Curated annotation (Swiss-Prot):
<keyword id="KW-0256">Endoplasmic reticulum</keyword>
<dbReference type="InterPro" id="IPR019411">
    <property type="entry name" value="MMM1_dom"/>
</dbReference>
<protein>
    <recommendedName>
        <fullName>Mitochondrial distribution and morphology protein 12</fullName>
    </recommendedName>
</protein>
<keyword id="KW-0445">Lipid transport</keyword>
<dbReference type="GO" id="GO:0008289">
    <property type="term" value="F:lipid binding"/>
</dbReference>
<dbReference type="GO" id="GO:0045040">
    <property type="term" value="P:protein insertion into mitochondrial outer membrane"/>
</dbReference>
<comment type="function">
    <text>Component of the ERMES/MDM complex, which serves as a molecular tether to connect the endoplasmic reticulum (ER) and mitochondria. Components of this complex are involved in the control of mitochondrial shape and protein biogenesis, and function in nonvesicular lipid trafficking between the ER and mitochondria. Mdm12 is required for the interaction of the ER-resident membrane protein mmm1 and the outer mitochondrial membrane-resident beta-barrel protein mdm10.</text>
</comment>
<feature type="compositionally biased region" description="Acidic residues">
    <location>
        <begin position="75"/>
        <end position="89"/>
    </location>
</feature>
<comment type="similarity">
    <text>Belongs to the MDM12 family.</text>
</comment>
<feature type="domain" description="SMP-LTD">
    <location>
        <begin position="1"/>
        <end position="276"/>
    </location>
</feature>
<feature type="region of interest" description="Disordered">
    <location>
        <begin position="68"/>
        <end position="104"/>
    </location>
</feature>
<dbReference type="Pfam" id="PF10296">
    <property type="entry name" value="MMM1"/>
</dbReference>
<keyword id="KW-0446">Lipid-binding</keyword>
<dbReference type="InterPro" id="IPR031468">
    <property type="entry name" value="SMP_LBD"/>
</dbReference>
<dbReference type="InterPro" id="IPR027532">
    <property type="entry name" value="Mdm12"/>
</dbReference>
<dbReference type="GO" id="GO:0000002">
    <property type="term" value="P:mitochondrial genome maintenance"/>
</dbReference>
<dbReference type="GO" id="GO:0032865">
    <property type="term" value="C:ERMES complex"/>
</dbReference>
Amino acid sequence: MSIDIQWNLLDEQIAEKLRAKLDTKIAKLSLPRYIQDLHITSFDFGTSVPDVTIQDICDPDPRLYEETLYSDDSSSLDDEESDREEENMTELPPYGATENGVHKKDSTDVNMNHTQTSNQQSPQNIAESNIHKSVPNSAETPSFLRNSIGDVQIIAHVQYSGNMTMSMEACLAVNYPSKDFAMLPFTLQLSDIVLDGTLVVALIASHVHVCFVDTLEHNRGDVQSSIIKNIRVDSVVGEPNKQVLKNVAKVEKFVVQKICQIVEDEFVWPSYFTLY
């Protein structure tokens, strides 16, 4: 079953909340010596609507109820999220991003497509194994975790290839002939973002939780992204009219890989993002 999405409801307030969450994680990164003050300046959902195919409608996962109760009773949701993320970090699959970059004059396309092996499960089976099998029967679920009328969880296959964009800024340090001899302003624009994955949306009381389910079978040394399939990178180093360097592939690769890693860590189950 396919549905129409009111994409315009993802307004500036939600975009800013997402930008702030990503920027908080960026600020905690260990940066190379030549990159300083890396931060996200803007995020825009764009106007292109993803293709969404509903795979299942069911009761929300009980663990989402636990978090909803904690967040309602807590004065600091961010602290609760941080605690949860640290506890769940060991549950996340190995991460990496394959970069088959096509370097053009002022841009880089980072393609993360993969070939699925015959023994891999379908997105539907993965979603069922990762979500449904973890949900106890109602008799096994404590009464305070049982869903109320109207609570629902939607599992859907989402394909997106649109005009979503994100802008970043940083300073590149020139350490020759001495340390920090010069600081060059660096701007980076991420666009042509392609997403393909199984999305879970849980509506619980007044809260909306979203996350992706990893549909890849990860092996040691696996360098594939389960969600992001492509990103175009446009970068400028130096003043716009006095460019010193172009296509700083090493910096672009680092930034894109870290962005993809954050997406995997923060938006792939058992981690999730609360829209409201």
